[in-house]
C-alpha cells in the first residue's frame, strides 16, 4: 500500500480533500505501522486537521479500519519550519527547535522523559518526522532539575 493509496482513501472519505479545499501536501508511511500526513487549507475558516478527522473521528475511522493496525498522524502544514518539526514529532512535547543555517537539519530540545515518544517504536516516529519535514532531526535531551539533583546526591 503506497502513499497514493492512502491519499485516495482520504479523497474518498473527506469531501474537502476530494474538492481541493483541503490539500494533502505530503504523506510518509511505514505501511502497517504509521503514516504521517501534512495537510493545509487555503480557506482560513477550514481547520484541515479537524476536517480530515471529522466529528468524533467519523471520517478517519473508515480509513483506519482499511489500514488495520496502522496509525495515522495528521499534521497541519506550517510555513514555520520550527513549528512544523515540533508538530511532526508529536506525541512528544518539544521545548525548542533550531533549524540549521543550510536548512538541512533541525536540532530539537526536549525533556529526557519525552525522548522515547519522539523516537517512537523502532525509531519510526523520528524517521517519519524527518521524511515529512525533509530535515535531519537531531534530539537533544534536557535534564530536569530533579535529574540534576539526583545525580548530585548520588555523587556524595
Task: Identify the role of each PLM range.
Residues 1-156:
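RNA-contacting regions in translation and RNA-metabolism proteins
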Amino acid at each position: 500500500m503506497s502513499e497514493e493509496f492512502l491519499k485516495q482513501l482520504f479523497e474518498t472519505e473527506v469531501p474537502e480533500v476530494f474538492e481541493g479545499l483541503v490539500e494533502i501536501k505530503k504523506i510518509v508511511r511505514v505501511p502497517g505501522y504509521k503514516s504521517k500526513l501534512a495537510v493545509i487549507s487555503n480557506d482560513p475558516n477550514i481547520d484541515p486537521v479537524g476536517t480530515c478527522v471529522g466529528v468524533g473521528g467519523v471520517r478517519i475511522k473508515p480509513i483506519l479500519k482499511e489500514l488495520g493496525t496502522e496509525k495515522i498522524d495528521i499534521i497541519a502544514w506550517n510555513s514555520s519550519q520550527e513549528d512544523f518539526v515540533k508538530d511532526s514529532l508529536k506525541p512528544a512535547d518539544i521545548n525548542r527547535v533550531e533549524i540549521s543555517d543550510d536548512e538541512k537539519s533541525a536540532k530539537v530540545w526536549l525533556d529526557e522523559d519525552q525522548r522515547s515518544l519522539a523516537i517512537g517504536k523502532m525509531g519510526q516516529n523520528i524517521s517519519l518526522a524527518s521524511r515529512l519535514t525533509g530535515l535531519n532531526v537531531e534530539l537533544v535531551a534536557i535534564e530536569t532539575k530533579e535529574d540534576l539533583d539526583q545525580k548530585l546526591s548520588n555523587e556524595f
